[in-house]
Amino acid sequence: MYTYDSSGETLKIAIAWKIILKKPKGKNIKDYIEALRKGIEDQEHCEKYASTLLEPRPKTKKDVVLKNSNVTECVALKAKPFSKKIEDMDIFLLTNVHENLQEKRQTSGSLAHLDIEYTFNGLFRFLKCTADIKLKQTKVYEGADFLRIKTLFEEIFMFLKRDCKSPLVLTRLVELGDYVLDLIIITQSIMQNNANNGTGVISRAKFLEFYVFLEQLIFNKLSFASVEQLEKLLDQIVKRMKICFTYCKNDNPSIRLLYSECFFSYAEIYFPCLHSFDAQLSSAASKCVQILRDIITNEELQTDKQELSKSAYSAPSILLIGLKDMLFPEDIS
């Protein structure tokens, strides 16, 4: 038994003896002691690092930038490999918009401002990619892909229905409706240029049909949300039809063809609204009939019967016949 030694020799001997007992066989005593020292240093370093993580972190310049850009929270997400290859980035991002909106709708009563902005920004982004004038040819989507796109838009609008009457959703819906009307002219122009250059137009034509479908979808939501905004958007369509009819008389055959096709696209949107079983939608569309009635009256006054027979197959005459067929008899008289 060792007794207390003020010089510490007894403690040193005890430690030395413990080291000798624990030292692995075949290992030099000096190397073993160095390894023990390194282990103690590593442990102290880990404890010191852990204590710094618990201390409040001072704000950095990056934090200030994030605050100024309205980013309220940064979440570090673990890297997650995709389970399958992304075949089409545009559809993938549109699907993300759909899934985010679906999740928000299931977990909360109403949508937050950022959720609404994220949704409509995603819709605008997708539509912009479908009518990029820099691309001679759009992506060729098969029937199943187009059905998927239509379904995504339909369900997104269904998720938005509960918030359709909110000022932000209403404003963005009208903006989207105006944008789709612009896309029709852009797409018709691209199709005409592609046809002249011998480039395919089938994929563009499919998207043209999709724009008509989407605009009618927007009208259905506005019919539920705001009759006033619905009437304004319908008025925009009819006024565009009037402009198209005017350009159909242009001396340039390319301009006549372009605006004739645009007239038909707008008519394909407007007249189903006029003849709709939705009383709200039909009533709103009927308030714009006067503009079309004036087109017929003015054209018949400017063209006598002899000239009308000579130009029976001209663009204005064909459009005039179409207008008379699509309007109610009481609207023509």
From Swiss-Prot:
Primary gene name: rec24
Spans through the membrane: none
Originating organism: Schizosaccharomyces pombe (strain 972 / ATCC 24843) (Fission yeast)
Keyword Phosphoprotein: no
Main location: cytoplasm
The keyword Ribosomal protein appears for this protein: no
InterPro entries: MEI4
Coiled-coil zones: none
Signal peptide location: none
Function: Required for correct meiotic chromosome segregation and recombination. Accessory protein required for Rec12 activity, which is involved in formation of the double-strand breaks (DSBs) that initiate meiotic recombination.
GO biological process: chromosome segregation; meiotic DNA double-strand break formation; reciprocal meiotic recombination
Subcellular localization: Cytoplasm; Nucleus
One GO CC term on file: linear element
Protein name: Meiotic recombination protein rec24
Subunit comment: Interacts with Rec7, as part of the meiotic recombination initiation complex.
Keywords, ordered alphabetically: Chromosome partition, Cytoplasm, Meiosis, Nucleus
Family the entry assigns: Belongs to the MEI4L family.
